[in-house]
Amino acid sequence: MKAVYKRELKSYFDSMIGYIFIAFLVAMNGIYFLYYNMLGGYPYYSYVLGAMEFIILMAIPVLTMKCLSDERRSKTDQLLLTSPVSLPKIILGKYLAMETVFAIPMAIFCLCPLIIKANGTAYLREDFASIFAFFMMGSVFIAIGMFISSLTESQIISAVGTFGIVLVIYLWPGISSMLPSFLTDNFITDLLPNYTVTGVMDSFTSYHLFDIGGLVFYISLIFLFLFFTIQSVQKRRWS
């Protein structure tokens, strides 16, 4: 798994995707940070992360689009299926490589609450909790993108498909409110407003609550989509 992780991580910076992904997130964060905190005087950095939710929807598909679709296009996916390393370890190695790339801008984001603190009142506990929640939300989107990438050999289809799915997830609270009552008056839809991907994030950024149940929900989704990815790749072994 370590060799897969190193190879995959290196590929993101050899192809410039890693640099573009990091630069885009850091630049957009800087714009929102300047607007909300430096010029607007808001003491909570979490406001910036709330505004960054849509930005991450656009960035994640760029990161995940090649992770498995490129292997399928170049026919090197057969090497994955015959590798002495188990398939779950290969998938996990690739996932952790993307997580590492994503963690770099997150580490830079951690400087922002400290800058606020140096210039006045800051709420470090709430802000760092929000950064962690933002990282976990992005990790869910990465797992989803990885699964979509396993379904196609086209990077463009992978990116567009991932963006479409995470966009629906982002808009789901509004979509569900417009559904007919006979579709929404049940146990599942009563549960969903409390545990939606963006709803959990809002608990941290808007209400400053450390939502443990929401984090468990995130972790469950990550494992679920990693499992789907393993099954998707495994299916090709027998096809």
Please report, for each region that a protein language model flagged, where it lies by residue.
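Helix-capping/transition residues at the boundaries of transmembrane alpha-helices
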Residues: 11, 69, 80-82, 145, ...
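Secretory targeting signals
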Residues: 29-36, 45-51, 55, 97-162, ...
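Short amphipathic alpha-helical coupling elements at transmembrane boundaries
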Residues: 3, 7-11, 78-82, 193
